[in-house]
């Protein structure tokens, strides 16, 4: 197995085991962070999340679509310094529309069925991060980059 294939497998395993991520956006006054429920597509090219259009998060994304998302598997114990893994995703956000919307919505809701009413609301936007790079940190300081080709 190639290093790229191993990293992709590692990411899929992490993403399937985590429900929430920290989304970093940028406002005119500075950075802003939120917890979001996410879904990663199997090809790892997109990460999906939902938000209401009336939020600061949505406003920030409308002005500055570049984001960072952090997903990790920490347990909040001492061993995390050497055993936990964190992934920072860098990419651009777009609202999902057109023919892919129903497909992506079904995938997202399969992972987060408790968010059905929220996602079906007309006020809710389903958003996708078009991933540029994954920064994978393991064993405290081992950093690996995985660049995604569109």
Predicted regions and their residues:
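Short beta-strand segments
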Residues: 18-53, 61, 68-73, 81, ...
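Short acidic (Asp/Glu) patches
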Residues: 51-55, 70-76, 105-115
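Charged, gly/pro-rich active-site loop segments
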Residues: 2-3, 81-150
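Short helix-coil transition/hinge motifs at the ends and kinks of transmembrane helices
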Residues: 6, 76-80
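Extreme N-terminal tail/first-helix region
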Residues: 1-21
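A short, polar/proline- and glycine-enriched secondary-structure boundary/capping micro-motif
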Residues: 58-62, 147-149
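Structured helix-beta-strand junction loops
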Residues: 17-18, 64, 111, 132
């Amino acid at each position: 197995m190639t290093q790229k294939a191993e990293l992709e497998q590692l990411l899929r395993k992490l993403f399937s085991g985590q429900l929430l991520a920290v989304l970093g956006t940028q406002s005119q006054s500075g950075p802003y962070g939120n917890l979001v429920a996410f879904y990663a597509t199997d090809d790892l090219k997109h990460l999906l999340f939902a938000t209401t259009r009336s939020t600061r998060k949505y406003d920030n994304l409308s002005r500055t679509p570049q984001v960072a998302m952090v997903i990790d598997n920490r347990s909040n114990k001492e061993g995390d310094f050497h055993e936990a893994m964190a992934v920072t995703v860098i990419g651009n956000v777009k609202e999902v529309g057109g023919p892919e919307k129903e497909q992506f919505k079904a995938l997202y809701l399969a992972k987060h069925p408790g968010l059905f009413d929220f996602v079906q609301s007309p006020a809710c936007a389903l958003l996708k991060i078009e991933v540029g790079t994954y920064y994978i940190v393991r064993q405290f300081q081992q950093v690996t980059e995985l660049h995604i080709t569109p």
